[in-house]
Amino acid sequence: MAGVRHDDGSGLIAQRRPVRGEGATRSRGPSGPSNRNVSAADDPRRVALLAVHTSPLAQPGTGDAGGMNVYMLQSALHLARRGIEVEIFTRATASADPPVVRVAPGVLVRNVVAGPFEGLDKYDLPTQLCAFAAGVLRAEAVHEPGYYDIVHSHYWLSGQVGWLARDRWAVPLVHTAHTLAAVKNAALADGDGPEPPLRTVGEQQVVDEADRLIVNTDDEARQVISLHGADPARIDVVHPGVDLDVFRPGDRRAARAALGLPVDERVVAFVGRIQPLKAPDIVLRAAAKLPGVRIIVAGGPSGSGLASPDGLVRLADELGISARVTFLPPQSHTDLATLFRAADLVAVPSYSESFGLVAVEAQACGTPVVAAAVGGLPVAVRDGITGTLVSGHEVGQWADAIDHLLRLCAGPRGRVMSRAAARHAATFSWENTTDALLASYRRAIGEYNAERQRRGGEVISDLVAVGKPRHWTPRRGVGA
C-alpha cells in the first residue's frame, strides 16, 4: 500500500505509512502532492453532483443501484450537515418523477427528462447525454453566474456531462469513476459480455479532462494511472463510508427470530445485485458441498442477470439445495442490518469490486466476511482478522473457505473476529469520507483558481470575446 500524504493544516504535508484498513484517506497519488496550501477558504458553497444512469434515491440491489447510490446520497447528506448545499442531477425514469425532490435540508435531487422513461438500457444512455446536458445547463441558467462552485460527476456517463458543465460554468470538475471498463473486461464472469469500446474511449476523455480524480483505494489509483495515464498528482483516495448508526452489532438471536431462522443453523448471506459479475452462483455451488448450511440471497436481477431473472432459483433446484436457500428482495438499510446480524458470515464473491461496501456494512454489524481478493475488497476486509480473502473463484476453494470460517465463528475465535470486524468497519465512517471529499474539493477549487490567476485571465477573456465558453482548457489527448 502506498504511503498516505497528510495535510496537518499547517500547509506542510507530511508523509506517513498508513494504518492497514484505516478509513477515508487524503492520498494525492504516488507522485506526491502539490506544495499549495489549501484551506477551508476553498470550501464550496454549492456542489452540482451528476448521476446520469442511476438515482441516489433508487433502492440498492435493484437495477443498476448499489454501493454507488449509497455513496452519492450519504456523502450529499453529510456535506449538507456541514453547510454545503448539494444538488444532484439524475435522469428521470418514470413520468411520475417530480422535477425536484427535496431529500433533506441542503440536498435536492433534480430529475432531468432525457429520453424515454422506461426501456432504455444503460448502454443506450450515451444517445441521451445531449438531452441530459441541456437539462443540467438550463437548470443553472436561471441563476446568476457562479451559482455552483464545483461539479462532481459519478461514473463515466456523468463525467461526459460534467466536462461540458465545467467548461460552461468556469468551475472545477471532480470525477469518481466507481468502475473502469478495462478492469471489468479483464475479469469477466461466465455469461457476462465485455464493456463496449465506446465506454473505454469515454472514460479516457473524462480522465484527461477532470481537474481531480477521486478513487476508492490505492489499488484503483494505480489502475487509473496504468490504464489511462492519469496524472498521479490529480488523484485523491477517498474510502466510502458506512452508516454506523444503522450498521452496528446487535442480538443475533433477535435478528434470527425476526427472519424466522433457527438459532443453531449455520447461515451465510449474500447481498447484492443478481448478475454474473457479483457471482452469487459461487455461493450456491459452494453450499451444495456443505450440508446443513443455509444461504440467504438478498437482491434483485440486474445487468446481464436480467436475461435470466430466475436463473439463481433454478440453479438452487438443480443443485438440490432449494430447501436451504432463502431468496429475499432488496432490503432497506434497517432490514439489511438485521440480516447481517442474523448471518454467521457474509459472502462477497464478486469478480470485480472497486471497494465492496456490503463487506464493510456486514463487518460493522460484527459479522465476518469471506470475500474475493479483488479490487478494493482487500482494503474492506482484513484477511485472517475480520474475515477471509479467497483468490480465484474455484468452487471447492470457496467451499473450504466458507466451512473454515464457519468453524472459527462457532468458537472463541469467532467472538474475537466479530469484535475486530466492528472495530475495522468503524474506521470507514461517513464523517471520515466527508473530510476526505472536502479536502479534494478544496484542492480542486484552490488549484483551479490559482491557475486562472497565473494566467491572469487573459486566455479566458480572449475566448469569451470570440464566443468560446467561459472556460476552455484542453488536456492531454483531447483535441480542440
UniProtKB/Swiss-Prot annotation:
What the entry lists under InterPro entries is as follows: Glyco_trans_1, Glyco_trans_4-like_N, Mycothiol_biosynthesis_MshA
Residue ranges of the region described as Disordered: 1-42
Q: Which GO terms describe its biological process?
A: mycothiol biosynthetic process
Q: Which UniProt keywords apply?
A: Glycosyltransferase, Magnesium, Metal-binding, Transferase
Residues binding 1D-myo-inositol 3-phosphate are H53, D64, A65, G66, G67, M68, N69, K122, Y155, T179, R199
Disruption effect?
Answer: Increased intracellular levels of ergothioneine, 8-fold increase in reactive oxygen species-producing cells, decreased resistance to the antibiotics rifampicin, isoniazid, bedaquiline and clofazimine. Increased oxygen consumption and extracellular acidification rates, which are further increased by membrane uncoupler CCCP, indicative of electron chain dysfunction in the absence of MSH. Absence leads to alteration of transcript levels for 139 genes which probably compensate for loss of redox control. Loss of induction of some pH-inducible genes at pH 4.5, including the redox-sensor whiB3.
Q: GO molecular-function annotation terms? A: acetylglucosaminyltransferase activity; D-inositol-3-phosphate glycosyltransferase activity; glycosyltransferase activity; magnesium ion binding
Going by the entry's taxonomy, the superkingdom of the source organism is recorded as: Bacteria
| Family from the record | Belongs to the glycosyltransferase group 1 family. MshA subfamily.
Protein name in the entry: D-inositol 3-phosphate glycosyltransferase
Query: Organism, per UniProt?
Result: Mycobacterium tuberculosis (strain ATCC 25618 / H37Rv)
